[in-house]
Amino acid sequence: NDYLEINDILYIASNKSSLLKESNKARAKKIMQKANITTADFFTTEPGEHKNIKAMPIIFPLFVKPITGGDSRGIDKNSIVYNYPSYKKKVLEIKKNQHSRCLVEKYLSGKEYSVGIFKDNITGSIKAMPIEIKVKQNVNGHHILDFDIKKNDEEKVVAVLNVKIFNQLSVLAKKSFIALKGKSFGRIDFKMDHLGNPHFIEANLMPGIRKGYFYRSCLLNLNMNYKEMILKITANGLH
């Protein structure tokens, strides 16, 4: 995108600076904290750091995932950890298989949501399109949107009918998008804690434009078909 900007070529989605902010999940969470947007307590680590439970900045249960990457790679039934041995094992596994540092967050046990974003590049107005992502219970009794569930398309995506939650998510998603200096369109993910309070999880300022979460957020909120979505993204990118 930098090359396109330098050469005055129009493009869709955000610039390189914004993409770098959201691609590192810890960096994105720090930006949210500065913007007073709630996100779970966290730290980053890799094998050899935080060598015992006393060195842990936050207490169990925790959620362990790669600090970068998409499609829930590195996330499975063992991502929720309740003790130091399982934490250590998961951190090592991510380093070995994903070649990544880990983002370790306080585990949030509530519902999962994603909010599609359209920003009008002329007026600056932002449209938020919340959806709920429902996942079946795994063998450990948890509802985790893991790699296999995404790969096999086993999750269920539904409209957010609760007006209070819809409005909460819409406001937070818009604030998050602005904090990351997003352009044109994107997607912001949230998860509830056990009390039903939404927490920022991560952002995707260049979401896939196949029939994934962004498309489904357009369909469920705007009754927009796939062709209409593509034309809107393209037209907006040309302004």
Spans of features found by a protein language model:
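Short coil/turn motifs at secondary-structure junctions
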Residues: 47, 120, 136, 206-208
